[in-house]
Regions:
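Short beta-strand segments that buttress and anchor functional surface loops
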Residues: 40-42, 88-95, 116-122
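Mid-chain, well-packed structural core segment of small domains
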Residues: 90-107
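Short, surface-exposed coil-to-beta transition loops
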Residues: 98-103, 116-118, 129-133
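Bacterial N-terminal signal peptides
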Residues: 9-20
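Edge beta-strand at a domain terminus
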Residues: 123-144
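Short, solvent-exposed loop/hinge segments that bridge or flank secondary-structure elements
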Residues: 39-76
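N-terminal helix-cap/turn-to-beta initiation motif at the start of protein domains
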Residues: 24-37, 81
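N-terminal secretory signal peptides that target proteins for export/translocation
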Residues: 1-6
Length: 144
């Protein structure tokens, strides 16, 4: 009887310690992205006077953390992967004569983001253009 009681006490202590701990590990893998409206800037790298930075306001969330306008007509997100604080993606935009593929990454820290995007633009009968951009951004508030 004494052994059985000791086992029950040990088991109850184990479960009272294990369950809260296991819920920490079972939690959904989320990046430290505060959802809302984000002001995203893409600056060509290295900076030149010919290319002004591309600035856009995007609504970002845990389900849509990629800081590019993939909802634009002719654009689609091909892959998205999350590792720790960083989102990696491949996207493609098709216009009449051009196809632009972008490969990028964005590392979040609550209200700010930093990363890089490499684009490859090809057009029929023209040489493929490759560009590298530095990506920065800050959360501005709630989405409208």
């Amino acid at each position: 009887m004494r052994v059985r009681r000791l086992s029950l006490i040990t088991l109850s202590i184990f479960w009272s310690l294990f369950l809260p701990l296991s819920s920490c590990f079972a939690a959904k893998n989320e990046i430290p992205l505060k959802e809302g409206a984000w002001n995203i800037t893409l600056q060509i790298n290295p900076p030149t006077s010919d290319f002004l930075p591309i600035v856009q306001m995007l609504c970002l969330s845990q389900t849509e953390p990629v800081p590019i306008p993939a909802k634009k007509e002719g654009c689609r997100l091909l892959t998205k992967e999350i590792e720790g604080n960083t989102v990696f993606w491949v996207a493609e935009c098709r216009e009449k004569e051009f196809v632009t593929r972008s490969v990028g990454n964005a590392t979040y820290d609550s209200n700010k983001v930093e990363g890089a995007v490499q684009t490859m633009t090809s057009a029929t009968g023209k040489e493929t253009e490759m560009r590298t951009y530095t990506l920065t951004g800050k959360r501005q508030g709630n989405c409208r």
